[in-house]
Amino acid sequence: NLWQFEMLIMKIAKTSGFMFYSSYGCYCGWGGHGRPQDASDRCCFVHDCCYGKVTGVVVCGGDDPCKXQICECDRVAATCFRDNKYWFFPAK
């Protein structure tokens, strides 16, 4: 869920996803369009694409493969935020 994603970003990137990325560039936050504005916005673009590849209904619990795929999408995005400098590009 969104709160778990925030906690993962805080742990890996040492920053708040809500504060810095919830309304950033073209792809961070709800929806997405156009060309990513920078490397951080591209992290969000790739995250959106990753979620789009997960099929079926995501059900929390146990050995659900969809839950594992969603977690991996979130982990990759959090690592991407850590590895790419944040610039201020307000949502477009």
UniProtKB/Swiss-Prot annotation:
Domain of life, source organism: Eukaryota
Tissue specificity field: Expressed by the venom gland.
Enzyme Commission code: 3.1.1.4
Cell compartment(s), UniProt: Secreted
GO cellular component, one term: extracellular region
Known role: Snake venom phospholipase A2 (PLA2) that induces significant edematogenic activity. Shows mild cytotoxicity on Trypanosoma cruzi and Leishmania infantum. Also inhibits ADP- and collagen-induced platelet aggregation. Does not show myotoxic activity.
Quaternary context: Monomer.
Reaction(s) this enzyme catalyzes, per UniProt: a 1,2-diacyl-sn-glycero-3-phosphocholine + H2O = a 1-acyl-sn-glycero-3-phosphocholine + a fatty acid + H(+)
Summary of pH dependence: Optimum pH is 5.5-8.5.
SUPFAM superfamilies: Phospholipase A2, PLA2
Enzyme class: hydrolase
Protein name (Swiss-Prot/TrEMBL): Acidic phospholipase A2 braziliase-II
Protein family (similarity comment): Belongs to the phospholipase A2 family. Group II subfamily. D49 sub-subfamily.
CDD domains reported for this sequence: PLA2c
GO annotation (BP), single: negative regulation of T cell proliferation
Family annotation (Pfam families): Phospholip_A2_1 (PF00068)
Cofactor note: Binds 1 Ca(2+) ion.
Chief location of this protein within or outside the cell: secreted
Entry binding sites for Ca(2+): 27, 29, 31, 48
GO molecular function: calcium ion binding; calcium-dependent phospholipase A2 activity; phospholipid binding; toxin activity
